[in-house]
Amino acid sequence: MTALFQSWGLPYDWAWFVSTIIGILVIALPLMLAVAMIIYADRKIWAAMALRRGPNVVGPWGLLQSFADGAKVFLQETIIPAAANKGLFLLAPIITFTVALIVWAVIPFAPGVVLADINIGLLYVLAASSIGVYGVIIAGWASNSKYPFYSALRAAAQMVSYEVSIGFVLISVVLWTGSFNMSAIVEGQRAHIFGFINGYGFNPLLFPMAVVFLISAMAETARTPFDLTEAESELVAGYQTEYSSMSFALYWLGEYANVILMCGLNAILFWGGWLPPVDWAPLYMVPGIIWFFAKLLFFFFVFSWVKATVPRYRYDQLMRLGWKVFLPLSLFWVFLVSGWLMLTRYGV
């Protein structure tokens, strides 16, 4: 696209800037629309699990319910508590929402369909996603209320705890594929696993890490059964208690954007991304972006299924799972994958 704008007479710097802005909008605007539909799907899945109808009034089959909710929130007044730190109170949801968007810059939807195909894409994802904890901490502190503050402390401890496990899981993936580039990680899953399984993206050696990543992603995004940050019986609405109007909506948008991101990362890192499930010629007639979103939606259904069926963990159980189970397991798997590669790939 930069070359196209240059052909129209724009200098290279301006052509690059305009093409980058267009690329950001092409990703951000559909993502916001996807969040609205994902919220609708989430509510429909919960309703089906509880033998209810769910949203069914606004629009055909209730499809416009999320947009009606968004319009209602947009028209509400933003109320700032008298004792709150006004500047930080308004900044916190912006941080959370912005971080949820910038990570998508390196997510490849199909071959060549990525905003920034950088060689440290996976490292960028880990670094950028870890910034989200600041939005939570600032919200809890700036609200100047005990319930948001307690919730922010819980959220910070929870997010930091499971980021460690996720980091070691990502190291296992990098060792296997030999690259931090997200597109290269997907292409690295084309090879037949162990030379005899003719399938894309399914790696028996990394499968336990796929499970660890999925559960850790639920904890990282504070989804049930790990939503201890907003346990209604203890902390009212968590660190969002004092928020209303669009500032509250930004947290919701950021949360669901992060959920979609984690589902997409799971598909990219462990299940072949845009590659078809098996190496069968007719499956290549389906565009790669369709395979990517099909896998993403499957994992989102798993997220919603777990949320509707699994009871909430106690906080001590949550921390024990992260530090005493997932951390040792993921660290052990780094050594296991390293040893396997030394014996098989490098002939040591």
From Swiss-Prot:
Topology class, membrane: Multi-pass membrane protein
Transmembrane parts of this sequence: 21-41, 87-107, 120-140, 166-186, 193-213, 258-278, 283-303, 323-343
Pfam families: NADHdh
InterPro entries: NADH_UbQ_OxRdtase_su1/FPO, NADH_UbQ_OxRdtase_su1_CS
Listed GO CC annotations: plasma membrane
Keyword Cell inner membrane tagged: yes
GO-annotated biological processes: aerobic respiration
Domain of life (superkingdom): Bacteria
Keyword Cell inner membrane: yes
Family: Belongs to the complex I subunit 1 family.
NCBIfam families: PRK06076.1-2 (NF004741), PRK06076.1-6 (NF004745)
Physiological role: NDH-1 shuttles electrons from NADH, via FMN and iron-sulfur (Fe-S) centers, to quinones in the respiratory chain. The immediate electron acceptor for the enzyme in this species is believed to be ubiquinone. Couples the redox reaction to proton translocation (for every two electrons transferred, four hydrogen ions are translocated across the cytoplasmic membrane), and thus conserves the redox energy in a proton gradient. This subunit may bind ubiquinone.
Subunit and interaction comment: NDH-1 is composed of 14 different subunits. Subunits NuoA, H, J, K, L, M, N constitute the membrane sector of the complex.
Record HAMAP family: NDH1_NuoH
Designated name of the protein: NADH-quinone oxidoreductase subunit H
